Amino acid sequence: MTYKDYTGLDRTELLSKVRHMMSDKRFNHVLGVERAAIELAERYGYDKEKAGLAALLHDYAKELSDDEFLRLIDKYQPDPDLKKWGNNIWHGLVGIYKIQEDLAIKDQDILAAIAKHTVGSAQMSTLDKIVYVADYIEHNRDFPGVEEARELAKVDLNKAVAYETARTVAFLASKAQPIYPKTIETYNAYIPYLD
């Protein structure tokens, strides 16, 4: 299948829509995640088109206003606790509704991978893990530990998920930031892979 089979748009048309939703820096990141996701899909025997599309759309809603996110929460996921978290959580979990509104994506695997890319899940599909890890390791990323994450991603996707999640939890804790409950669940489910 191609991107057009999932969206009704070919890659060029889709890139135009995605580009319109974000800054140049974010768009370059998205292209890097798409590339990393396709590479991971090839390595782990997953559908490259599906992985590439999920990656291309993973930050589609990242630069929406808080008011737009609150509208989407009220319309699709009326959860008062969700409202307290903000964009870092919303753009995945709630952003899928904007993607459905704008692009009519119906594939539940793609939507789930986009929803989970910010917080993970105790149960992640191969596609979920690909997008989650690709977002962390794409070639534009430059931070302590990213090279180790890239190497882990080449040998074991579960170890890469565990490493990324452990680093994220440690970073948030070091900044005295709240940690989304699903992220803690992801950590607890995957940390045994690092033993």
UniProtKB/Swiss-Prot annotation:
Reaction equations catalysed: P(1),P(4)-bis(5'-adenosyl) tetraphosphate + H2O = 2 ADP + 2 H(+)
Enzyme class: hydrolase
Keywords, comma-separated and alphabetical: Hydrolase, Iron, Metal-binding, Nucleotide-binding
UniProt xrefs under SUPFAM superfamilies: HD-domain/PDEase-like
Amino-acid positions noted as binding Fe cation in the UniProt annotation, renumbered to this chain: 29, 58-59, 135
EC number per UniProt: 3.6.1.41
Domain HD: 26-140
GO MF annotation: an example: metal ion binding
Function recorded in the entry: Hydrolyzes diadenosine 5',5'''-P1,P4-tetraphosphate (Ap4A) to yield ADP.
Similarity remark: Belongs to the Ap4A hydrolase YqeK family.
Known partners and oligomeric status: Homodimer.
Protein name: Bis(5'-nucleosyl)-tetraphosphatase, symmetrical
Species, as recorded: Streptococcus agalactiae serotype V (strain ATCC BAA-611 / 2603 V/R)
Organismal lineage: Bacteria, Bacillati, Bacillota, Bacilli, Lactobacillales
